Amino acid sequence: MSLLEAFAEILEPADVHVAQRLTVLADEPDASVELAVALAVRALRGGSVCVDLRSVAGQVELPDLPWPDPDAWLAALAASPLLGQPPVLRLFGDLLYLDRYWLEEQQVCDDVLALVSARPGGAVPDVSRLFGAGFEEQRAAAKVALSQGLTVLTGGPGTGKTTTVARLLALLAEQAALAGKPSPRIALAAPTGKAAARLQEAVQLEIDQLDLIERRRLTGLHATTLHRLLGPRPDTSSRFRHHRANRLPHDVIVVDETSMVSLTMMARLLEAVRPQTRLVLVGDPDQLASVEAGAVLADLVEGLGSRGVAELKTSHRFGESIGALASAIRTGDADAALAVLAAGGEHIEWVHEDPVEQLREVVVPHAMRLRQAAILGDQREALATLDEHRLLCAHRRGPAGVDHWNRQVQRWLGEETGEPLWGSWYVGRPILVTANDYGLKLYNGDTGVVVATPDGMRAVIGDAGTFATGRLTDVETMHAMTIHKSQGSQADEVTVLLPSEDSRLLTRELFYTAVTRAKTRVRVVGAEAEVRAAIERQAVRATGLRKRLRPAGV
């Protein structure tokens, strides 16, 4: 049996194919090098940008596999022609990369450090004017952002990130006015359409509370997706119109929900930012990382530390119990989280026995209200109703998965109305866009509802408008959605379906992300063992960015 065959339990055919192809092309005979290549490809599927050859055996938790000795393994790789010129693989300490991801990580590091060290200069406005008593954390964050080119603004839900951003923009506009310059060109962006819409709404609400002179300086702000900001190209999905040779024209760029931004997307953003631009990256590093490879926000927080990170710690939004639950999950205190769940109350419900009937009592009335608004053709009411409740699942398939619960809710709707839903399109169908469509200006993560109109069924999708259903191909039903897809959005009430405790997706970050999607009420469906498993298991992504960012010797 070959070494790759011995690892068949953890490798996919694609991992093996790439490893075999590369080693043959490089005339590399060492089986341990071939295994390392396969593991590097496998790592990308799991969200890592590299594989840590000293710790991978412990992370896989299959000690009986014939793991190579780490020192001999690293020595074999260092001598491999695959690390020659041009390199196919790269080593960074114990970390093995495919060349592309090594280059992207180094580029992100270089660009971040250049922006952090940039000192824009100019008169500094009176920060305390907009950040008075009770805003000490936000005031400190604004001072950091006014003093350098890049700021990472972190905090959980309700800690005042949006307030800080809006008032920081007012201060930057004031700074420009003091220097006799026009108001800065400002871009607001987020990874998804839903997150961008939330960002624009929240920032505008804060700006509307400022004095008239500030409001005039900040007119016309419009949030967009990162893809739209960078300018999609029809010939490629990984490169954009704006890049190092054609930079973005903005003086200030704010990116929200940065935890969702992959390493590759961050590289594309940073190479398009002018050296004199202020870049503010906003997010919650305790949430799920991007679907694609990387853990950029968490790496920036750990790697930059006090050099570029401003953390907001005090939450002002949640009902006390939701905040307490989120805090217990974030800090890994399973006993405290279970105590909050057991106490229940107005904002918390814990369903830890057969949930089917209880879920029916929740999801069917919501689906019926959505259907009623859609039948009446009330687009605004339909979209508002859509955001009243979310049913969130960890998995797509299986008894606790999105596919199962979408079918179940549709069956219940058919029973309730006496009209079985035979077709894929129906009035009242909640939909989720699953891929970017640059022609229609629809983006992955946009949500909407199918409504009745005099011209037949139309899909109303956020701020993008209405569309004939026949024009939409990359959409799916959204009576339930995955927790990953819910990032960047919120609902008044959220129901979280935890998978079985042995699910590899069940992690602290997943649970925390799900709970913090709720504005006013969260319902957790799962046994005590599943709650404990979620809180005690942290997602591990292998990256080298935080190490690269740290000062030498730290």
From Swiss-Prot:
The keyword Lyase does not apply. It holds the Pfam family AAA_30. SUPFAM superfamilies: P-loop containing nucleoside triphosphate hydrolases. Its EC number is 5.6.2.3. Heterotrimer of RecB, RecC and RecD. All subunits contribute to DNA-binding. Belongs to the RecD family. This is RecBCD enzyme subunit RecD. It comes from Mycolicibacterium smegmatis (strain ATCC 700084 / mc(2)155). The lineage of its organism: Bacteria, Bacillati, Actinomycetota, Actinomycetes, Mycobacteriales.
